[in-house]
């Protein structure tokens, strides 16, 4: 499974419409409006790199209202659950 994070700039006033269009595409599991240099962040999960290329170049970049994209391919996933297990040394007594 390939996971990618797509950073998206949208035309002024089109962020909500772009987000709705994106979440309708197969492979895009989530879309977030964000503050900062980008307007949206989309999370993509697909089976292989060819499907990722088809989705980004063939469908995402053609969504009306998208000005630019920057795609980041994830190498390793970390979550709070993973971090808690990593730092658990087996001592459940509170620190005093």
Specify the residue positions occupied by each region the protein language model found:
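A compositional/biophysical signature of low hydrophobicity enriched in polar/charged and small residues
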Residues: 1-96
């Amino acid at each position: 499974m390939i996971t990618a994070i797509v950073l998206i700039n949208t035309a002024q006033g089109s962020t909500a419409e772009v987000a709705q269009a994106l979440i309708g595409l197969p492979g895009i599991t989530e879309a977030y409006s964000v503050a900062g240099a980008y307007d949206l962040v989309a999370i993509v999960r697909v089976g292989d790199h060819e499907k990722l290329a088809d989705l980004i170049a063939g469908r995402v970049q053609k969504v009306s209202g998208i000005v630019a994209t920057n795609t980041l391919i994830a190498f390793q996933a970390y979550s709070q659950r993973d971090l808690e297990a990593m730092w658990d040394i087996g001592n459940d007594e509170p620190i005093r």
